[in-house]
């Protein structure tokens, strides 16, 4: 079978589920993974023939995609902040929007690092706490971006912690002489549990924040495949994770520390009220490139 034929047929098979451009992109991602082709190979090499030994793998993957399983789960990985992260249905697929939080957190963390660097080997490392870590994308990004940083990361799910701890960045850790995040099982909603942590320069989180009533506006590939516990909160108490994050911050973040947490764009102002009530007088809602409320920064 010609690659061009497969791309055309695969795109058509997914067009009832996705816009044509997205359907085509998904098929090309699959071909790149299985065949090692580029997204233009079928155009510049119209006679490119798919190895018969590879066809069963492509066809099996297409069957999963036709059931609207996210392509990231089918491939077993996704890109985040310039790195490849393993993902499976135990963890939320990292979104590009979360890269904005990481970008700004790295800027803040590097500012602390530069302030301390004149002390050389005696300098205190930048300490960062990641709550609701999921795939570990935030924790790993911070650990690999801020030299010598210490990054404990918390989640309640054993399966998620296994994915997070299993991310393969050993060579980058070694080349940068930095430290692997420490992945800890704990319930973020239980901020009083016995746990030795802190003090932290930053507390970061991408908690569940989508209200149950918002499900009707969401795609099937999210609702049927991504973990509900990482996405949804009850309509009658949608801010419960933010109250918990505020308590963790009160308990473990240093007085000079800064917190950053993703928010539900429709509940940003209410979320801001939670942190102000917890004693964080300085808050800011940061918008993304689509001008949507994306995350909150809070500090004393």
What does each model-found stretch correspond to?
Residues 72, 210-213, 266:
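Active-site beta-alpha loop architecture of Rossmann-like, nucleotide-cofactor-dependent enzymes
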Residues 31-108:
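Conserved AdoMet
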Residues 1-35, 40-43, 50:
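Non-catalytic accessory regions of SAM-dependent methyltransferases
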Residues 100-217, 244:
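Conserved SAM/SAH cofactor-binding pocket of Class I
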Residues 30, 68, 98, 138, ...:
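Residue-level signal for inorganic ion chemistry
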Residues 14, 109, 168-172, 249, ...:
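Conserved hydrophobic residues forming the short capping helix/wall of the S-adenosyl-L-methionine
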